[in-house]
């Protein structure tokens, strides 16, 4: 529970981690709450930071929220199977992310089609 805050912070993560047997965990994903603005400024102590945007959110999502992309190591452009129906160019989203942060790894994904998952795993260095 984040209380009145719109995001998780390192203190909340630390409290949660104390309740887990970390010897039984090989990989832990933490999904911050809120939108792409609020959690961008808060470092949770992660080894890698991933931002996920969907083509259904429109072509403007990356340029509208540059800070989360600056703070991230990997950008996942999700639901690319819906791009044509939405009139969105996923390559534009990729270019925008790379323009904001040239070192970001960008992966196009369609979970429905099963594409891009291996690339995400590779980007995570797993």
PLM segments and residue spans:
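Conserved nucleotide-binding/hydrolysis micro-motifs of P-loop NTPases
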Residues: 34-36, 56-60, 80-83, 112-115
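Nucleotide-state-sensitive switch-loop elements of NTP-binding domains
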Residues: 1-47, 115
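Signal for well-folded cores of large energy- and translation-related assemblies
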Residues: 18-21, 37-41, 54, 81, ...
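Short, well-ordered secondary-structure micro-motifs
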Residues: 8-11, 39-43, 61-65, 87-88, ...
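TRAFAC-class small GTPase G-domain
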Residues: 3, 9, 19-22, 29, ...
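Canonical P-loop GTPase G-domain recognition
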Residues: 74, 82-126
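Inter-motif core of Ras-like GTPase G domains
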Residues: 32, 39-57, 65-77
């Amino acid at each position: 529970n984040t209380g009145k805050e719109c995001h998780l912070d390192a203190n909340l993560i630390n409290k949660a981690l104390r309740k887990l047997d970390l010897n039984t965990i090989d990989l832990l994903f933490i999904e911050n709450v809120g939108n792409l603005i609020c959690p961008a400024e808060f470092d949770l102590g992660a080894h890698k930071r991933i931002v996920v945007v969907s083509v259904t959110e429109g072509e403007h999502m990356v340029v509208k929220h540059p800070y989360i992309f600056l703070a991230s190591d990997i950008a996942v452009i999700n639901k690319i199977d819906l791009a044509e129906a939405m009139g969105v160019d996923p390559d534009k989203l990729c270019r925008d992310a790379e323009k904001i942060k040239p070192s970001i790894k960008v992966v196009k994904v369609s979970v429905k089609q099963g594409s891009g998952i291996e690339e995400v795993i590779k980007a995570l260095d797993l």
